[in-house]
Amino acid sequence: LVIHSRAADEDMAAILTEETGKGAFPFLLHCFSSGPELARVGVALGGYVSFSGILTFPKSEELREIAKTVPLERMLVETDAPYLAPKPFRGKRNEPAYVAHTAAVLAQTVGVGVEEIARITTENAFRIFSKMPRV
């Protein structure tokens, strides 16, 4: 289940808590830009947190602080193309190639190398999207 939640952190945390109580299921907090509590609840319930180009914006310091709290095995990186292009492409049409910029900021934020964050987030993507063929 891919979830895009905006300005509804408390409701989303309550819904996830209630629904996962009926049985675990894979879910992804897509294009995450919410607060630390939703990230904490999502991870605690077995979900993944995916960071987009928003992570690279100068004013996204709080989001980078939240990223530091997400376990590596529960994070992904994404483009959200054609929207939310990372710095230095902000304001332009986003494209998949730009995900490398977001990955670089995520790697720096959590203190690992870019190659390591690429490996980890790729493995996480295959884990959550388990039917996706490895090419």
Describe these PLM feature segments.
Residues 49, 83, 127:
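Active-site micro-motifs of SAM-dependent methyltransferase domains
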Residues 1-76:
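Catalytic pocket-lining loop regions of alpha/beta-barrel enzymes
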Residues 26, 60, 96, 115-118:
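Short, structured helix-loop boundary elements
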